[in-house]
Design a protein with these regions (language model features):
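Conserved N-terminal entry element of GNAT/NAT acetyltransferase domains
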Residues: 1-19, 169
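Acetyl-CoA-dependent GNAT
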Residues: 15-96, 107-109, 113, 117, ...
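Active-site-proximal loop/turn and secondary-structure-junction residues that shape catalytic pockets
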Residues: 92, 128-130
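Conserved G/P- and acidic residue-centered "switch" motifs that form tight phosphate/ATP-binding loops
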Residues: 101-103
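Conserved GNAT acetyl-CoA-binding A-motif
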Residues: 114-127
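Conserved catalytic-core motifs of GNAT/GCN5-like acyltransferases
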Residues: 125-128, 140-161
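Helix-turn-helix
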Residues: 135
Length: 169
């Protein structure tokens, strides 16, 4: 550790391995940002991805410490029945590793993946509640803009905020 703060040296982003699923679910749960149902759905999604969704263009990348320990992951995929629209479904960074540019790194990788596969824009959605203000600030900071807001989408008083980034620029 340099100056008491962990560095990002030696971290590698690569294809998610089936043996990492439990660790990734634990990372997401450990952030304190996701509801119990969302965590359960994530576990199912990762198993489905490994079983079949990877053949449909869904991509899951894990960011690992030099020793191989997962510190984050990004899950992104083409939107069904569209040409060039992709979704950034999951972006998770270990609670203790946030603020070190790791989320930005994974988003940039997801953008590059999608661009290579013909995407012209990438969408990300989040909640409009105060609790998710840091998430919305993150998307603003990495160049996404609000494309739409669906009032009361998740629950009364909990809007869905959809962010978009044009990948052609």
């Amino acid at each position: 550790m340099a100056g008491g703060k962990k560095t990002n040296q030696g971290m590698k982003l690569g294809r998610t391995k089936p043996g990492e699923f439990d660790a990734l679910v634990a990372l997401a749960a450990g952030t304190g940002m996701f509801k119990k149902l969302e965590i359960e759905v994530l576990g199912e999604l990762l198993r489905d991805w490994h079983a079949s969704l990877a053949t449909e263009g869904h991509l899951c990348r894990t960011l690992r410490e030099a020793d191989g320990t997962p510190v984050g992951f990004v899950y992104h995929a083409p939107a069904v029945m569209t040409k060039g629209t992709w979704h950034l479904y999951w972006l998770v960074v270990d609670k203790n590793a946030q603020g070190r540019g790791l989320g930005r790194r994974m988003v940039r990788h997801a953008e590059a993946d999608a661009r290579k596969l013909g995407a012209h824009h990438l969408l990300a959605e989040t909640s409009g509640t105060a609790r998710y203000a840091p998430t919305r600030a993150f998307y603003d900071k990495v160049g996404y803009s609000v494309e739409a807001r669906v009032r009361d989408f998740y629950a009364p008083g909990d809007d869905q905020v959809i962010y978009r980034k044009d990948l052609r620029r």
